[in-house]
Amino acid sequence: MKNVKCLLVAGLILFVGNTSAESRRQKVGIFGTEVQFTPFGHDDDYSLNSLKFRYFMTDKDALRLKIGFGVESLKYEDDEFGGNLEKGRLGDLSVDLGYERHFKVAKRLSLYAGVQVGVYKHFASAKVEYTEDLGNGSHTYQVVYKNCVPTSEGNVGERAHVGVAASVFTGLDFYVYKGLYLGTEVGIYVMSTKTNQTELKYSDKVIKGTDTYRAVICNAIKPMVRLGWTF
């Protein structure tokens, strides 16, 4: 039995050795697609947050298209919010176009670095039911928040905005077998954003916000886990 186990291990080693030379598939004309996960995302949730497509112009140079997305449902504790939150959503959508330069580290391992630019949209909306005590009774009404969500006091809180961004990044690709690979990526980005006009609607009244503002944000890209395939 022990000899059989030794033969199996030896065979596995020979198999990996024979396939490792063809495991790294980064050649001119190769197309790749991958999903990207953020293990340390919002509230430490492990969530899928983007798709990436890659095309190798040469054995070392690749163009990339990245589409990012995410949706979060709002929740309030009963003692923190003055109304009944019927519906609340925060969302994000981004489209980035970039360039990667690849460096062979080993037969199965590739290091790359690059730059990208893109556009970004942050969504925010909510629908809340409030009950007002009038002394001799109560009055219930609904408020629709557009391009914003309420604070725990019912005021305008987080707002929707649009932006443009540029980033630099570096990452690793480890080819498990032929075109299948695992990887990670980190980087930094600079983004210029502008808030959208807010709107509160209740009964027959509409209150539109008059203030919009711009902001410049510089931050690190959270480490991500990537699973991809080249063909």
PLM features per residue range, with description:
Residues 2-11, 18-34:
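Outer-membrane beta-barrel biogenesis signature
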Residues 32, 39-40, 151-152, 158-159, ...:
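Short leucine-rich amphipathic alpha-helices used at interfaces
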Residues 34-48, 70, 107:
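Solvent-exposed loop/turn segments connecting transmembrane beta-strands
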Residues 37-41, 89-96, 202-203:
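Short, charged, low-hydrophobicity "junction" segments
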